[in-house]
Amino acid sequence: MNTFLPQKWMRLLFVLPVLNFTFGCTQKFNDVSATVQEAYGNYIDVELTPEEIESVPYASAYLKIGSQKQVFVVLAFAESNPLTGQTQLKWVSADKAMVVTENGHIVKTIGLQTTNLAGVYGDVPAYSHSSAQYVLSYDWSEQYRYGFQAHVERSHQGKEILTTPISSTETEVYTEVVTFPSLEESVENTYWVDSDGQVVKTRQHLGPTMVPVELTILKGYSKS
């Protein structure tokens, strides 16, 4: 069980807002990760109590890669994507990994112990019970693989109650089949969406033959 040090989070109140983070600024990235790590002891396979989660003054989530143990991540930055107009959420772990999402869709990763996603581009329609088809473009940083077109078919699967240590939420479950014609491969992703249309849990493959990445929101992001 993780040994949590709530008072350490007070340092985050001063560190995170002034960092003006960019991906190219390694020192600032390290500062965020180090501060998060100092806030609690064992950040791998962590299971926080409801009180510990509520003590964190930022949005937070559990991140799990394949069969690896889950880690705790916090929302360090929320920035508008000028290409889509969507808010990009940048989740940071204590071991210097980052996952970037746009309403639950993982669009970039840094420092994961798997093939990292350099970018996903394209317009994703809002969630509805009607089926949807759209096209995305995938870039992977490993071996500089860029511009792989993907055809996506999304369908509604029904309702499911999603339970975390601090909430129980009725969700609509959607699956999407992502097909890469040039690779003759496909993957299936799953999204749990609340009544406000926000993704509160996702299980996604970053590409063909890659292990799934699972992100479960504990405390959600709010613009207010």
Please place each PLM-identified region on the residue numbering.
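Acidic/charged, solvent-exposed loop-and-adjacent secondary-structure segments enriched in E/D, K/R, S/T
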Residues: 118
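Bacterial N-terminal signal peptides that target proteins for export
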Residues: 2-14
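Hydrophobic membrane-insertion alpha-helices, especially the h-region
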Residues: 17-18
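C-terminal motif of bacterial Sec signal peptides marking the signal peptidase cleavage site
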Residues: 21-24
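Acidic, serine/threonine-rich low-complexity disordered tracts
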Residues: 26-101, 105-111, 133-224
